[in-house]
Curated annotation (Swiss-Prot):
Record-linked PROSITE patterns: WRKY
Protein name (record): Probable WRKY transcription factor 27
Lineage: Eukaryota, Viridiplantae, Streptophyta, Embryophyta, Tracheophyta
Family under the similarity heading: Belongs to the WRKY group II-e family.
Feature: compositional bias, Acidic residues: 274-315
Length: 348
């Protein structure tokens, strides 16, 4: 019984102890909350804390150095909206292109060099073209054409009769062969004035020998002559020849007169004086002929330079030797001299 009582008592006691513990715990929790409320006063408001700080600062002002405080306010710049990737602004694209072009212009060229040319403007030359440019600069300049393209040219086809009826005075100064034609080409210049630039070329047609092809170059700088000399087309006017001395008479009467002349001591010998004058005239004529030959040779050389590229043939100007020889033959004969005859008569 006692054990059962104990067991029942233990059960009742255990139940009563659990209920008391729960009540005590709940009461204990209420006591703890009340204690916390009593021990922790509510926090003071913010303005009171700030006022206490101000009071502390005011109390410490006499002991602190005087300082001035400035407050600056910083405001962030307004944020620009980012450009849309799908449709960029044309102004932005234009600025980007300008920046790229400026950066490319600032870069020095790598394969380009500048050489000072002969002219005032600068030339950009690549490395491969440097040798070619130096070769071109080292070559001598081509000889300029003398009045080649500046004078007008007139070509006429005339017959023999019309060729001889030319009213201008011409002088032939040379000729040269023509490629593909058996007839040579004759060159004439105006003989009326020394400074006249008029020229004439005469050649016989290869198709019709009765037709002459006449090419006039340049213009006359003087009026047309009133009369034309018969030798104007071939050579210049030479000085008039000295009249030949007539041959002495071989009659017996003339021999007697000669003896009287030679025997007279007071009579001067006029025959020797005439012979000396004749020899002096021959020397003067020979000098004039030599001077004219030199002038013709110089003119042939000048005209050879002017006509060097006509018809793509070799320029070989042949001077007018035939006419010159004909004129020289006129003075080739020596005049008769009386000195030998006079000496023979005097000795007899």
């Amino acid at each position: 019984m006692s054990s059962e009582d104990w067991d029942l008592f233990a059960v009742v006691r255990s139940c009563s102890s659990s209920v008391s513990t729960t009540n005590s715990c709940a009461g204990h929790e209420d006591d703890i909350g009340n204690c916390k409320q009593q021990q922790d006063p509510p926090p003071p408001p913010l303005f009171q804390a700030s006022s206490s700080c101000n009071e502390l600062q005011d109390s410490c002002k006499p002991f602190l150095p005087v300082t001035t405080t400035t407050t600056t306010t910083w405001s962030p710049p307004p944020l620009l909206p980012p450009p849309k990737a799908s449709s960029p602004s044309p102004n932005i694209l234009l600025k980007q292109e300008q920046v790229l072009l400026e950066s490319q212009d600032q870069k020095p060229p790598l394969s380009v060099r500048v050489f000072p040319p002969s002219t005032s403007s600068s030339v950009f030359v690549f490395r491969g073209q440097r040798d070619q440019l130096l070769q071109q600069q080292s070559q001598p300049p081509l000889r300029s054409r003398k009045r080649k393209n500046q004078q007008k040219r007139t070509i006429c086809h005339v017959t023999q009769e019309n060729l001889s009826s030319d009213l201008w005075a011409w002088r032939k100064y040379g000729q040269k062969p023509i490629k593909g034609s058996p007839y040579p080409r004759n060159y004439y210049r105006c003989s009326s004035s020394k400074g006249c630039l008029a020229r004439k070329q005469v050649e016989r047609s290869n198709l019709d020998p009765n037709i002459f092809i006449v090419t006039y170059t340049g213009e006359h700088t003087h009026p047309r002559p009133t009369h034309r000399n018969s030798l104007a087309g071939s050579t210049r006017n030479k000085s008039q020849p000295v009249n030949p001395v007539p041959k002495p008479d071989t009659s017996p009467l003339s021999d007697t007169v000669k003896e009287e002349i030679h025997l007279s001591p007071t009579t001067p010998l006029k025959g020797n004086d005439d012979v000396q004058e004749t020899n002096g005239d021959e020397d003067m004529v020979g000098q004039e002929v030599n001077m004219e030959e030199e002038e013709e040779e110089e003119e042939v050389e000048e005209d050879d330079e002017e006509e060097e590229d006509d018809d793509d043939v070799d320029d070989l100007l042949i001077p007018n030797l035939a006419v010159r020889d004909r004129d020289d033959l006129f003075f080739a004969g020596s005049f008769p001299s009386w000195s030998a005859g006079s000496a023979g008569d005097g000795g007899g």
